[in-house]
Curated annotation (Swiss-Prot):
The name this protein goes by in its record: Dual specificity protein phosphatase 1
Tyrosine-protein phosphatase domain ranges (all copies): 50-191
Any one GO CC term of the record: nucleus
Native species: Arabidopsis thaliana
Domain of life: Eukaryota
GO annotation, biological process: protein dephosphorylation
Sequence segments annotated as region (CaM binding domain 2): 151-180
Predominant place of localization: nucleus
């Protein structure tokens, strides 16, 4: 996971994000960085525990939103798609889960999961339920999956899908590697459209 997924318990903050940390020994640096991560986790749970509605039956959010059982039930969420390597299902007896174990790094291949994630979202909707797609912060990995879903299901361009998601969840910001994978998806969809237009 990268520092893009702020607050991630397993992400390592760069020294530059904590002014003056260079003067401490490695053990103290690690302790300070761990404390900063704990504070960020607590802030995420406090401030971001309600998912964002992207479209009918599709929500996007953070780990805190995925833990908020009462809100999820009130939104008719029946399925939860977790896009993170270190997060376990919070309520395995209450929701249908799919976990895609990936880290938020530019070299992570998230594109290989696009089709199965789209199928999972479609299945939840077919059954009359709703699905929450989340990672740790609901900023990069989960956003990438939701953008890919909108592109594949509605024929949106990358720009249209990303703008729509950002209008519903302003923190949305896939890492550069995920943007490249979405650009590849867009190109493959354009080639497919050209092929079938003959």
């Amino acid at each position: 996971m990268s520092s893009r997924d702020r607050g991630s318990p397993s992400s390592s903050s760069s020294s530059s994000s904590l002014p003056g940390i260079e003067k401490y020994n490695e053990k103290v640096k690690n302790q300070i960085q761990a404390l900063v991560r704990v504070i960020k986790v607590a802030r995420t749970y406090r401030d971001d525990n309600v998912p964002s509605l992207i479209e009918q039956g599709l929500y996007l959010g953070s780990v805190a939103a995925a833990s908020n059982k009462n809100v999820l039930k009130s939104y008719n969420v029946t399925h939860i798609l977790t896009v993170a390597s270190s997060l376990r299902p919070a309520h395995p007896d209450d929701f249908v889960y799919k976990v895609v174990r990936v880290v938020d790094k530019e070299d992570t291949n998230l594109e290989m999961y696009f089709d199965e994630c789209v199928d999972f979202i479609d299945e939840a909707k077919r059954q009359g339920g709703s699905v929450l797609v989340h990672c740790f912060v609901g900023k990069s990995r989960s956003v990438t999956i939701v953008v890919a879903y909108l592109m594949k299901k509605h024929g949106m361009t990358l720009a249209q899908a990303l703008q729509h998601v950002k209008s519903k969840r302003p923190v949305a910001s896939p890492n550069a590697g995920f943007i490249r994978q979405l650009q590849d998806l867009e190109k493959s969809m354009q080639v497919s459209d050209q092929f079938f237009s003959f």
